[in-house]
Amino acid sequence: MYRYKITIEYLGTDLAGWQRQAGVMSVQQILEEAIYKFSGEQVILFGSGRTDAGVHAVGQVAHFDLSKYLEPHKIITAINYFARPYAVGVWNCELAPNNFHARFSATSRYYIYRIINRPCPSVIDLNRAWWISSPLDVPAMQQAAAYLLGKHDFTSFRASSCQSKSPIKTLTELNIIKEDEEIKLYLSAPSFLHHMVRNIVGSLVLVGKNIWQAEQIKDVLEAKDRKAAGPTAPASGLYFVKAAY
């Protein structure tokens, strides 16, 4: 068997997320069907991160096995041809060791969350960022973010449907940068809880609106109660950037 590692980008707006689900179109299904059309083999695609409906990716990593060797550049061309007309594309393909696993071999995952912060919405960024019309206090958000760095029990920022065995995670990066009318939040960790990034963003926005003081984020973290945290930020602003190995 030959194991292939592919890197994928997609717009999640009209998709049901990464994972295959009955009755809806997912990234996994689109790619698995595309691979079958040119290889004749039913494969199972394993992704480095299972993004939700509406979440985008610029560097999602996945792997699959084929019984015969195909040149990686031909695999890229074939997948992109058969994945049409969906907003899903493969931009890299390479052979990987048989013990490589896109999910379990990953040592870190990186996300970006985009906020458009101006009085009028951005037509260009429709469904690609969270539009917030009122000015956000970015320094206060940065101060609050510092409380979340490191190893913590992130139960307060965990979705009720989360299947992770432990709420203990290590947030290695949480940077907030304002560039003109756009605010970007950069987050990285070895792994994340379900909705963890979006729940963190939703809570930091409450700080940015001066509804909460920055210090309240520490109280939310220590509460270990989802009801203590802010709302879940929209999926449209979230991007899976890359996985490190």
Curated annotation (Swiss-Prot):
GO terms for molecular function: RNA binding; tRNA pseudouridine(38-40) synthase activity. Its EC number is 5.4.99.12. It catalyses: uridine(38/39/40) in tRNA = pseudouridine(38/39/40) in tRNA. The keyword tRNA processing applies. Gene3D superfamilies: Pseudouridine synthase I, catalytic domain, C-terminal subdomain, Pseudouridine synthase I, catalytic domain, N-terminal subdomain. Keywords: Isomerase, tRNA processing. Substrate binds at Y111. One of its GO terms (biological process) is tRNA pseudouridine synthesis. It is an enzyme of class 5 (isomerase). InterPro entries: PsdUridine_synth_cat_dom_sf (IPR020103), PsdUridine_synth_TruA (IPR001406), PsdUridine_synth_TruA_a/b_dom (IPR020097), PsdUridine_synth_TruA_C (IPR020095), TruA/RsuA/RluB/E/F_N (IPR020094). The active site is at D52 (nucleophile). SUPFAM superfamilies: Pseudouridine synthase (SSF55120). PANTHER family: PSEUDOURIDYLATE SYNTHASE, TRNA PSEUDOURIDINE SYNTHASE-LIKE 1. Belongs to the tRNA pseudouridine synthase TruA family. Homodimer. Formation of pseudouridine at positions 38, 39 and 40 in the anticodon stem and loop of transfer RNAs. This is tRNA pseudouridine synthase A. The gene is truA.
